[in-house]
Amino acid sequence: MTNIRKTHPLTKIINNSFVDLPAPSNISAWWNFGSLLGICLIIQILTGLFLAMHYTSDTATAFSSVTHICRDVNYGWIIRYMHANGASMFFICLFLHVGRGLYYGSYMFTETWNIGIILLFAVMATAFMGYVLPWGQMSFWGATVITNLLSAIPYIGTNLVEWIWGGFSVDKATLTRFFAFHFILPFIISALAAIHLLFLHETGSNNPSGIPSDSDKIPFHPYYTIKDILGALLLILMLMLLVLFSPDLLGDPDNYIPANPLNTPPHIKPEWYFLFAYAILRSIPNKLGGVLALIFSILILAIIPLLHTSKQRSMMFRPLSQCLFWLLVADLLTLTWIGGQPVEHPFIIIGQLASILYFMILLVLMPIISIIENNMLKW
C-alpha cells in the first residue's frame, strides 16, 4: 500500500514541500531564516488576532484600549509585547535573509527574488500601519510625517494625501482604515510567501558555494526539519528574553504619551528597522528627491540581478566582493544610527556620505569589483 502522505492531494503538497523535498547537502544556518520568517509571521498573526479582540480603532479610545490590554486582560501585556518585539525579530530575520541572498547570489532566481521584494514592501507597510494603532505621540506624528511625503508627488500629491487621511489631517478615519489594512495585510503576506516558496521550489535552493547541487541532494526531513526546529527555539528564546526582560528596549518612550496634534515631539523618528531608509530620506534637502531616494533604497534590490557581472554566483570565493559586502553592512548600520539622531552637524554630512556610499556600492563598485575579480582569475 502506498503511503497516504505521498498520495492524498493535501498531504502530497506538504510532503513535496517539507518532507521529501531534495535539498542541497551543504546549506548553512544562513538558510534558516526563511523558516524563521514563517514562524515570525505565525506569531504576529496569532498575537495580533488576540490584540484585535480587545483593541478599539477610535481616536478617543485607542490609547486607552492598549492600556486596558496591558493592565486588565489576562496575559495581555505579554501578548502586546510579543507582538511589538515580534515585529523587531521579524525585521532582524528579514534583513539577514536579504543579506544572505545578496552574499550568496540567491537573487539569480529572479522570480523568487522579486516576490521577496514585494514581500519586503508589504511587511514594511504593515509594520508602519501597526505602529500608528496605539495612538501615542510617535504613532500620530510618524503617520503625519510619512503620509505627508506623498504630497511631494507633482499635481496629485495633496489630493492623494487627503484621500489617504480621509480628511484634512491624520484623524479618526485614518486610524480606522490603518487598522483595517493592518489586519488584512498579513494574510496577503501569507499568500505571497506561499508564492515565494512555489517559485523557489521550481529551481531548488541555492547553496553557499553557488555551484549547482543537483548531484548531491538530501531529503529535507529529517535533516533540515531538525535544523529549522533548533533555529526556531533560538528565535523564540531571543524573542522571550526581549519580551520578559526589556520589552521597551526598542520602543520609543514618546509613544506612552497619548497623541496630541497640538504638541510636536522634539525628535520624530520611526521604529529602529526603518531608520536606515529614514536617514536616506533626510539626507536629500529636496522633498521629492528624498521620497524618490527612500523608495529607490529598497527598489534597488530589483536591479541587483541585472548588475551581476561576476562569473561566479556566490561571494564565497570572491574576497574583494566580500570586503565591499561588509562595507555595505557597516554603511547600513551607520545609516541606522544617523536616522535616530537629530538633524544637526555632524550628523547631516555623515548621513549624506553614508547615503551616497550605499548607492555607490550597489550600483557602481560591486559590478566593477566583480569584473576585476573575473580578470584576476586569468592571471
From Swiss-Prot:
<keyword id="KW-1133">Transmembrane helix</keyword>
<feature type="binding site" description="axial binding residue">
    <location>
        <position position="83"/>
    </location>
    <ligand>
        <name>heme b b562</name>
    </ligand>
</feature>
<feature type="binding site">
    <location>
        <position position="201"/>
    </location>
    <ligand>
        <name>a ubiquinone</name>
    </ligand>
</feature>
<dbReference type="Pfam" id="PF00032">
    <property type="entry name" value="Cytochrom_B_C"/>
</dbReference>
<feature type="transmembrane region" description="Helical">
    <location>
        <begin position="320"/>
        <end position="340"/>
    </location>
</feature>
<dbReference type="GO" id="GO:0006122">
    <property type="term" value="P:mitochondrial electron transport, ubiquinol to cytochrome c"/>
</dbReference>
<keyword id="KW-0349">Heme</keyword>
<feature type="binding site" description="axial binding residue">
    <location>
        <position position="196"/>
    </location>
    <ligand>
        <name>heme b b566</name>
    </ligand>
</feature>
<comment type="similarity">
    <text>Belongs to the cytochrome b family.</text>
</comment>
<feature type="transmembrane region" description="Helical">
    <location>
        <begin position="77"/>
        <end position="98"/>
    </location>
</feature>
<comment type="function">
    <text>Component of the ubiquinol-cytochrome c reductase complex (complex III or cytochrome b-c1 complex) that is part of the mitochondrial respiratory chain. The b-c1 complex mediates electron transfer from ubiquinol to cytochrome c. Contributes to the generation of a proton gradient across the mitochondrial membrane that is then used for ATP synthesis.</text>
</comment>
<dbReference type="InterPro" id="IPR027387">
    <property type="entry name" value="Cytb/b6-like_sf"/>
</dbReference>
<dbReference type="GO" id="GO:0045275">
    <property type="term" value="C:respiratory chain complex III"/>
</dbReference>
<dbReference type="Pfam" id="PF00033">
    <property type="entry name" value="Cytochrome_B"/>
</dbReference>
<keyword id="KW-0830">Ubiquinone</keyword>
<keyword id="KW-0496">Mitochondrion</keyword>
<dbReference type="InterPro" id="IPR016174">
    <property type="entry name" value="Di-haem_cyt_TM"/>
</dbReference>
<keyword id="KW-0812">Transmembrane</keyword>
<keyword id="KW-0813">Transport</keyword>
<feature type="transmembrane region" description="Helical">
    <location>
        <begin position="226"/>
        <end position="246"/>
    </location>
</feature>
<dbReference type="GO" id="GO:0005743">
    <property type="term" value="C:mitochondrial inner membrane"/>
</dbReference>
<keyword id="KW-0479">Metal-binding</keyword>
<keyword id="KW-0999">Mitochondrion inner membrane</keyword>
<keyword id="KW-0472">Membrane</keyword>
<dbReference type="InterPro" id="IPR048259">
    <property type="entry name" value="Cytochrome_b_N_euk/bac"/>
</dbReference>
<feature type="transmembrane region" description="Helical">
    <location>
        <begin position="178"/>
        <end position="198"/>
    </location>
</feature>
<dbReference type="GO" id="GO:0046872">
    <property type="term" value="F:metal ion binding"/>
</dbReference>
<feature type="transmembrane region" description="Helical">
    <location>
        <begin position="33"/>
        <end position="53"/>
    </location>
</feature>
<dbReference type="InterPro" id="IPR030689">
    <property type="entry name" value="Cytochrome_b"/>
</dbReference>
<feature type="transmembrane region" description="Helical">
    <location>
        <begin position="288"/>
        <end position="308"/>
    </location>
</feature>
<feature type="binding site" description="axial binding residue">
    <location>
        <position position="97"/>
    </location>
    <ligand>
        <name>heme b b566</name>
    </ligand>
</feature>
<dbReference type="InterPro" id="IPR048260">
    <property type="entry name" value="Cytochrome_b_C_euk/bac"/>
</dbReference>
<feature type="binding site" description="axial binding residue">
    <location>
        <position position="182"/>
    </location>
    <ligand>
        <name>heme b b562</name>
    </ligand>
</feature>
<protein>
    <recommendedName>
        <fullName>Cytochrome b</fullName>
    </recommendedName>
</protein>
<feature type="transmembrane region" description="Helical">
    <location>
        <begin position="347"/>
        <end position="367"/>
    </location>
</feature>
<keyword id="KW-0679">Respiratory chain</keyword>
<keyword id="KW-0408">Iron</keyword>
<dbReference type="GO" id="GO:0008121">
    <property type="term" value="F:ubiquinol-cytochrome-c reductase activity"/>
</dbReference>
<keyword id="KW-0249">Electron transport</keyword>
<dbReference type="InterPro" id="IPR036150">
    <property type="entry name" value="Cyt_b/b6_C_sf"/>
</dbReference>
<feature type="transmembrane region" description="Helical">
    <location>
        <begin position="113"/>
        <end position="133"/>
    </location>
</feature>
<comment type="subunit">
    <text>The cytochrome bc1 complex contains 11 subunits: 3 respiratory subunits (MT-CYB, CYC1 and UQCRFS1), 2 core proteins (UQCRC1 and UQCRC2) and 6 low-molecular weight proteins (UQCRH/QCR6, UQCRB/QCR7, UQCRQ/QCR8, UQCR10/QCR9, UQCR11/QCR10 and a cleavage product of UQCRFS1). This cytochrome bc1 complex then forms a dimer.</text>
</comment>
